[in-house]
């Protein structure tokens, strides 16, 4: 899996501007046990560099995309991170190795409950899982140094921009459901203005909930 991630990073360096990912991110990708986050029938494919179904019409993301999004977020040890779309909990686990605290929201109750139990069992004590609509963020713990959205939105949710700290970064796929979307890097400048940059074409499940 790690060799495949490295190869894809090289292949996409023209689009992403990244000939290599942060060594800390790659170390964590090699450490987090992906097999703990996939259903039993997907275990033979757990370490393939591909998305896998986890039930309820959702997927665990391709490891390369998890690594890229984590790298783009530039998470530091003291940071507080918000994730929208817990899914299996895999991305949250990766972020938990790099951040002080991870707050993650899942709208599909069975997935959220399973992820919470799984993360607790694996000892990720700095991750909190909430059931709810991630479009509105988690204002109680805002502002966040980084926000990762793991489902495609038709636009960048204004509540998430508000909850992003000045100097913070949001990584989010934007575009129509079930079509090719653009992975976007959203940066909130020190003066409160926002700049965006397209990183890479991607295909994510759609963000659900109220708009």
UniProtKB/Swiss-Prot annotation:
Q: Which reaction does it catalyse?
A: [protein]-L-isoaspartate + S-adenosyl-L-methionine = [protein]-L-isoaspartate alpha-methyl ester + S-adenosyl-L-homocysteine
Q: Which UniProt keywords apply?
A: Cytoplasm, Methyltransferase, S-adenosyl-L-methionine, Transferase
One GO-annotated biological process of the protein: protein modification process
Q: What Gene3D superfamilies does this protein's entry cite? A: Vaccinia Virus protein VP39
Main localisation, per the record? Answer: cytoplasm
List localization entries. Cytoplasm
**What Gene Ontology terms describe what this protein does at the molecular function level?**
protein-L-isoaspartate (D-aspartate) O-methyltransferase activity
Fetch the InterPro entries from UniProt: PCMT, SAM-dependent_MTases_sf
What Gene Ontology terms describe where this protein resides (cellular component)?
A: cytoplasm
- Can you tell which superkingdom this protein's organism belongs to? Bacteria
Q: Which residues form the active site?
A: 61
Which EC number(s) are documented for this chain?
A: 2.1.1.77
The record's similarity note reads: Belongs to the methyltransferase superfamily. L-isoaspartyl/D-aspartyl protein methyltransferase family.
Recorded hits in HAMAP family, A to Z, give:
PIMT (MF_00090)
The UniProt function text for this chain reads: Catalyzes the methyl esterification of L-isoaspartyl residues in peptides and proteins that result from spontaneous decomposition of normal L-aspartyl and L-asparaginyl residues. It plays a role in the repair and/or degradation of damaged proteins.
Report the NCBIfam families cross-referenced here: pimt (TIGR00080), PRK00312.1 (NF001453)
What's the protein called, per UniProt? Answer: Protein-L-isoaspartate O-methyltransferase 2
Native organism: Polaromonas sp. (strain JS666 / ATCC BAA-500)
Taxonomic classification, please?
Answer: Bacteria, Pseudomonadati, Pseudomonadota, Betaproteobacteria, Burkholderiales
């Amino acid at each position: 899996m790690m060799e495949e991630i490295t190869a894809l990073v090289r292949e996409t360096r023209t689009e992403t501007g990244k000939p290599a990912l942060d060594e800390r991110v790659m170390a964590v990708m090699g450490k987090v046990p992906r097999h703990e986050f996939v259903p039993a029938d997907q275990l033979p494919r757990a370490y393939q560099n591909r998305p896998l179904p986890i039930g309820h019409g959702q997927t665990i993301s391709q490891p390369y995309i998890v690594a890229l999004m984590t790298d783009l977020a530039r998470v530091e040890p003291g940071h507080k991170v918000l994730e929208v779309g817990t899914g299996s909990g895999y991305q949250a686990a990766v972020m938990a190795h790099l951040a002080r605290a991870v707050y993650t929201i899942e709208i599909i109750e069975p997935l959220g409950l399973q992820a919470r139990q799984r993360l607790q069992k694996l000892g990720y004590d700095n991750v909190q899982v909430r059931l709810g609509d991630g479009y509105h963020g988690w204002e109680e713990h805002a502002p966040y140094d980084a926000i990762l959205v793991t489902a495609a939105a038709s636009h960048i949710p204004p509540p998430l921009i508000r909850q992003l700290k000045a100097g913070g970064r949001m990584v989010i796929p934007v575009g129509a459901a079930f079509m090719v979307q653009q992975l976007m890097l959203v940066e909130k400048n020190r003066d409160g203005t926002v700049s965006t940059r397209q990183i890479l074409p991607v295909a994510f499940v759609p963000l659900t909930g109220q708009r």
